[in-house]
């Protein structure tokens, strides 16, 4: 049986930390779906389609990685895709409490669902999408925090939004 895992998130925008978790999960699972959440409650900087496009560009050379958007419950999305594993990243103890609650909620909705937690590598432990967004908004250098092949695209999308296009 081939194993399929889902790595869900808002990815607003994707960071090197996210990409590292995707690559490391590929060592464990045959196929990984990077599931981009609509997440209107977080009021993302980039639209769902833009975040999907950024992730597709960031993962274009990774075999057996698929990028899809979703706007349903994660437990339902996993069931629809036939996945039994959810991948999550934990940067700090504060992440663990939140992720534990979400993991239990998902398991209550889909008892076959397991959540696997990855710690970031030391070089990526401080990176978050909110830190990257703040740096972008203040015209700081951010390209070392995001996948190299997506940095220019992320910046062009940001400037397009800033101009109101």
Swiss-Prot record:
InterPro entries: Cyt_trans-like (IPR004821), PPAT (IPR001980), Rossmann-like_a/b/a_fold (IPR014729). It is found in: Cytoplasm. Its cofactor is Mg(2+). Keywords: ATP-binding, Coenzyme A biosynthesis, Cytoplasm, Magnesium, Nucleotide-binding, Nucleotidyltransferase, Transferase. One of its GO terms (biological process) is coenzyme A biosynthetic process. One of its GO terms (molecular function) is ATP binding. Pathway: Cofactor biosynthesis; coenzyme A biosynthesis; CoA from (R)-pantothenate: step 4/5. Substrate binds at residues 10, 42, 74, 88. ATP binds at residues 10-11, 18, 89-91, 99, 124-130. GO terms for cellular component: cytoplasm. The record marks 18 as: Transition state stabilizer. It catalyses: (R)-4'-phosphopantetheine + ATP + H(+) = 3'-dephospho-CoA + diphosphate. Its EC number is 2.7.7.3. Pfam families: CTP_transf_like (PF01467). Belongs to the bacterial CoaD family. Reversibly transfers an adenylyl group from ATP to 4'-phosphopantetheine, yielding dephospho-CoA (dPCoA) and pyrophosphate. NCBIfam families: coaD_prev_kdtB, cyt_tran_rel. This is Phosphopantetheine adenylyltransferase. The gene is coaD.
């Amino acid at each position: 049986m081939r194993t399929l895992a889902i790595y869900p998130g808002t990815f607003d925008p994707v960071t090197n930390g996210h990409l590292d978790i995707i690559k490391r999960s590929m060592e464990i699972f045959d196929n990984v779906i990077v599931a981009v959440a609509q997440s209107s409650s977080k009021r993302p900087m980039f639209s769902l389609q833009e975040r999907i496009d950024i992730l597709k560009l960031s993962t274009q050379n990774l075999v057996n990685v698929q990028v899809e958007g979703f706007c349903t419950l994660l437990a339902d999305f996993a069931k629809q895709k036939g996945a039994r594993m959810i991948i999550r990243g934990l940067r700090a103890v504060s992440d663990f409490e939140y992720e534990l609650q979400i993991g239990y909620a998902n398991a209550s909705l889909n008892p076959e669902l397991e959540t696997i937690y990855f710690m970031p590598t030391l070089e990526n432990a401080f990176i978050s999408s909110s830190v990257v967004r703040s740096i972008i908004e203040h015209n700081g250098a951010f390209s070392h925090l995001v996948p190299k092949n997506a940095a220019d695209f992320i910046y062009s999308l940001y400037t397009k939004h800033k101009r109101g296009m």
